[in-house]
Amino acid sequence: IIYPGTLWCGHGNVSSSPDELGRFKHTDSCCRSHDMCPDVMSAGESKHGLTNTASHTRLSCDCDDKFYDCLKNSSDTISSYFVGEMYFNILDTKCYKLEHPVTGCGKRTEGRCLNYTVDKSKPKVYQWFDLRKY
């Protein structure tokens, strides 16, 4: 399913070339960049010492953070809002990054950790992290 007015926002894309964008160009550009993230983990794949047990692809936190910021700064406010809601709030996925071992959660809202506490005395390892709510 691709969000109406876009070619890149949804499962896969329906563009005829990497340069083609839909009617909502700003939103679609955010989705295209997100789709081209160089660090992804497909469903069932293991990488960086982690295994993606979700039924969908998960991305590095760097790519998801850039996607979030891109959508928030898009001039296509309505389409960006709906795409952000779907990805960050409804899909309720996680991202991964290299960070000192998590020891707890300093602040939690709606079942998601917003502020992790880490043990800086130990070396960084790849771990799963909750995404921000949109």
Swiss-Prot record:
Q: Where are the transmembrane segments?
A: none
Q: In which tissues is it expressed?
A: Expressed by the venom gland.
Q: Which residues bind Ca(2+)?
A: W8, G10, G12, D35
In terms of SMART domains, this protein maps to: PA2c
- What does the entry's cofactor note say about binding and number? Binds 1 Ca(2+) ion.
Spell out the disulfide connections: C9-C31, C30-C70, C37-C63, C61-C95, C105-C113
InterPro entries for the chain:
PLipase_A2_dom, PLipase_A2_dom_sf, PLipase_A2_His_AS
One annotated GO biological process? phospholipid metabolic process
Spell out where the chain is glycosylated.
Answer: N13
Subcellular localization, as worded in the UniProt entry: Secreted
Q: Which UniProt keywords apply?
A: Allergen, Calcium, Disulfide bond, Glycoprotein, Hydrolase, Lipid degradation, Lipid metabolism, Metal-binding, Secreted
GO terms for cellular component: extracellular region
Catalysis performed (reactions): a 1,2-diacyl-sn-glycero-3-phosphocholine + H2O = a 1-acyl-sn-glycero-3-phosphocholine + a fatty acid + H(+)
Protein name as it appears in the record? Phospholipase A2
Q: Which organism is it from?
A: Apis dorsata
